[in-house]
């Protein structure tokens, strides 16, 4: 499964059928993703999502998801986020200039953009939330 926790009945079905599930809390963190409601790259994207509530709710959301789903045998992995910097690539870091790995249309390092090191800082914080509730899975 991806992007958000699913209904409990789906995990029960996966338990019975022997499916393996990666339980994922969210697909965006601090910044919105483009939501193409008319098709990929068609029309004007929407940016509605959970990013507005990220800082206030993410630790509780992660903890609640793990507590709710930890007894399901189908779950083999907790996911704290999926493509959290995609497709908008809001973060930047000086290493991008020298490595020439940033997307060409953005032109390398953007000093006014949020530091890419934030991704690791947030990930460590959310991983700690998971481990506080369940140490049996990665």
Language-model segments: residues:
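Active-site mouth of glycoside hydrolases
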Residues: 1-138
């Amino acid at each position: 499964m991806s992007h958000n926790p699913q209904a409990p009945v789906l995990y029960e079905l996966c338990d019975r059928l022997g499916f393996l599930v990666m339980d994922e809390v969210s697909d965006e963190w601090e910044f919105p993703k483009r939501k193409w409601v008319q098709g990929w790259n068609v029309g004007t994207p929407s940016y509605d999502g959970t990013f507005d509530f990220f800082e206030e709710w993410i630790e509780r959301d992660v903890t609640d998801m793990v507590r709710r789903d930890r007894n399901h045998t189908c779950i083999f992995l907790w996911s704290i986020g999926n493509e959290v910097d995609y497709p908008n690539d809001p973060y930047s870091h000086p290493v991008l200039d020298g490595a020439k790995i940033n997307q060409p249309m953005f032109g390398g390092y953007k000093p006014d953009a949020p530091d890419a090191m934030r991704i690791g800082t947030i990930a460590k914080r959310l991983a700690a939330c998971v481990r506080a509730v369940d140490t049996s899975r990665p």
